[in-house]
Design a protein with these regions (language model features):
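Short, conserved catalytic-motif segment at the N-terminal edge
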Residues: 23-75, 97-99, 164, 301
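Short, surface-exposed loop or secondary-structure junction motifs
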Residues: 116-311
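Short active-site loop at a secondary-structure junction
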Residues: 37-44, 64-126, 169-180, 244-247, ...
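Short beta-strand scaffold segments in enzyme catalytic cores
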Residues: 43-47, 294, 317
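Short, gly/Ser/Thr-rich active-site loops of penicillin-recognizing serine hydrolases
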Residues: 22, 298-302, 333-352
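Bacterial Sec-dependent N-terminal signal peptides
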Residues: 1-23
């Protein structure tokens, strides 16, 4: 009996090892197959499991270039920036600078004057979980004004006017995706630390994690991908401005895997903060939200994920803390359907 048990244990060990090695090949096969069907959409994928990193990529930096996209190619991560911002908020919580249930009133710069109806109403966690009820930036109008750089027209003056002129929170406590919420979280971080958001994200995330290809203001680098709108037209990368905390960081698969590695390690500052962001702050019949994170649960798994869409690129990040894996998908075209379908296939068939 002992011998057969030993044999079974070895067999299980071997099958686990081969399964572990099998996952990257299966992910690569799926991504390759998708690229063959969609040769105009370049893609870079990073995957980490039990601290082991795997990468795959297809396509070229642009039509003229023969340089292949790889793990170091730069993309817009767009709204994935929001979970970097919420992680910084959670780091401030760990440092006892703020609490998630603090009202925003005392943490906004002086230019913001909340109407009486709004005072002691909106919590920091409300901003981070998209339920503040505040009006948002009118993106359709901004795109009309400047289809290449819509957020360029958003200034601190516009932001303070939107907030200061708000007299009522029509849907407070209900989910409504918000750019302004994360722009305000950036303002709160700046007030708390007495530094710019750019300086804060560098000091507390980019430098300590050595994410040397994660860029803020200056992203004019040789390994930058080209952004394409859904029709295939070329889009500019968004320039840095006040809305940065909501979606203006640029990065690559390698650095985002570095970030995932820190998130999955509860001993790091980023990992400790990530635990706070994973707590459920909003729940209805359609969704559960942490601080910026979408939370997907079934009987076997809890997944934490966040997608990003600029005018010309799509991305998604997802991780499973219990099973100790994380994945980042970066596309050089705005194509949220493709991004979502790829992640679903990977999660449902390969990482189940």
């Amino acid at each position: 009996v002992k011998t057969s048990l030993k044999f079974l244990a070895v067999l299980l060990l071997v099958s686990n090892v081969s399964f572990g090695q099998d996952i990257p090949q299966r992910i690569d096969s799926l991504i390759k197959d998708n690229y063959k069907k969609n040769p105009n959409v370049g893609i870079s994928v990073g995957f980490i499991k039990n601290n082991e990193e795997y990468y795959t990529a297809y396509g070229n930096l642009n039509i003229e270039s023969q340089i292949k996209i790889d793990k170091n190619s730069l993309f817009e991560i767009a709204s994935i920036t929001k979970i970097l911002t919420s992680n910084l908020i959670a780091q401030a919580v760990v440092e006892h600078k703020i609490k998630t249930d603090d009202y925003i009133d005392g943490f906004l710069p002086k230019a913001f004057v909340l109407h009486e109806n709004l005072k002691n109403k909106i919590k920091i966690s409300d901003l981070a979980s998209h339920q503040s009820g505040l009006p948002d930036i009118d993106f359709a109008k901004l795109i009309e004004l400047n289809p290449q750089q819509p957020v360029n027209n958003v200034t601190i003056e516009m932001l303070t006017a939107i907030i200061n002129n708000c007299t009522d929170l029509k849907d407070y406590g209900k989910y409504r995706y918000s750019t302004i919420g994360y722009t305000l979280l950036g303002q709160i971080l700046e007030k708390v630390y007495g530094k710019s958001y750019d300086e804060i994200i560098r000091e507390k995330m980019i430098k300590p994690l050595k994410m040397s290809n994660t860029l803020t203001k200056d992203f004019n680098v040789k390994n930058r991908t080209t952004a394409h709108n859904p029709e295939g037209g070329i889009q500019e990368f968004f320039k840095w401005n006040i809305t940065a905390p909501a979606g203006l960081v640029k990065s690559n698969a390698s650095d985002m895997v570095t970030y995932l590695k820190a998130v999955l390690n509860e001993k790091t500052a980023v990992g400790k903060a990530a635990i706070i962001t994973e707590k459920i702050y909003y729940k209805d019949k359609n969704r559960e939200l942490g601080l910026g994170l979408n939370i997907g649960t079934d009987e076997n798994n809890t997944l934490y994920l966040k997608s990003g869409d600029s005018m010309g690129q799509s991305s998604i990040i997802c991780y499973n803390r219990i099973k100790n894996w994380g994945i980042i998908l970066l596309l050089d075209q705005r194509n949220s359907k493709m991004r979502q379908e790829l992640l679903n296939q990977i999660c449902d068939t390969i990482l189940k």
